[in-house]
Amino acid sequence: MLSELDQACIDHGFFLLSGHGLDDLIEQTWAITEQFFAGDRASKLAVMRDADNPLGYFDRELTKRKRDSKEVFDFTDPADPRTDQHNRWPADSDTFRGTLVEFYDACSDLAVRANELVHHALAFATASDIDATASLGSRTTSSVRLNHYPVGDPVPEGERVGLHDLGETALGHHTDPGVLTLLLQDMTGGLQAQAVDGSWVDIEPTPGTIVVNLADAMQVWTNDRYRAAVHRVVPMTSSDRYSIPYFFNPPRDAVVEPISGLAGDAKYAGFRWRDYMRARTDDNFADAGAEDAQITDYLLTP
């Protein structure tokens, strides 16, 4: 199994998890997600994201300078007062918040195990002595996002003045910035991954499974052995789509750099996670006039 996982991480950076034991909690999380997005607009705008705080509701996010056809709700670790003070919870949302707190905790545990599994595959394939936790520390900056992809524009017509045009896809092609992402997707479909040859492959929804995609920090840690998954979402034409990613991220002050135990010269200069993440979130909020931050910015030999 480890050799197969190693190959999947090399080829496209995607694999599926089953037998996770979270089915009941996932059903509850789906229910409150759909209820939130079906709620009145005033309630959502009351917890709207701004340039200073990327948490809360947003319906005009940019990917590679194109507006996405989705609305989202983001939150980070609700058990830590230092981070929860920045979360924007809707009014009268005890059930909403309680369910998402439980979901965050369960995904945090599962992400640690998924990260360990990937590192076991890496150590097995490279005959290296690698510590899966050495680059993480105790406090990550992980977050959860609730996604709703409607048929059509998520922004009401009267609010579109001055906004970027919608992109050709519901979510433009990109990689996630962190370590790995645990993704729940409903049965609508629409997620695509880019293969090594550049073609796009449908990631068909499979009941009872969680999609895992590797992200930028993992590609840097493994010195390009493993691939941050390039993915996108095609536009919805007949029914809405919902998805829920848990972004497993390094600690705020972590330095992201290739693992020293791997053979070969380092391909990347180290960089601070907080600086990289800030650049990525800033560009999602407003067009910085250039390509968004990428790990290729830190290649030692471009």
Predicted regions, residues:
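Peripheral, non-catalytic segments flanking oxidoreductase cores
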Residues: 1-302
